[in-house]
């Protein structure tokens, strides 16, 4: 790995829960490459799609049984759930945008059942949540399940923190 760092023209560090690149990590990178720019990136929510009753299916417009960009429909308290190996970034992103009533973690690659959907709805109602939010990765596993509350999938994308400097670096490289 150090050899690869020494050859890099730029380094992009993916932040997962951290607010910024630590001084220790920057110092470690600089041991192997003293000149290249270091950029920070993180996964952020770019929008939401509503998961419709009846499950997920291909649609003519390329959707997956959901209403495209339902971001405006999301107001109120939220129960967030997912089956990710490291769910903290997802939950943090939801908490930045909404009043987070509760979170429910499932094991990575969880296969959801109607019992899960019923339990999530019960927990959500018990803590005053008005809707459920999950990841697109999890949404594709919710086909045929019915929730007693609106359920949305968060679309995620990578965002570079100093986008102008990153764009300038990329443009100057060509």
What are these regions (language model features)?
Residues 1-131:
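C-terminal accessory "lid"/substrate-recognition subdomains
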Residues 131-136, 152-154:
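Conserved active-site loop/cleft motifs that coordinate metal ions or position small ligands
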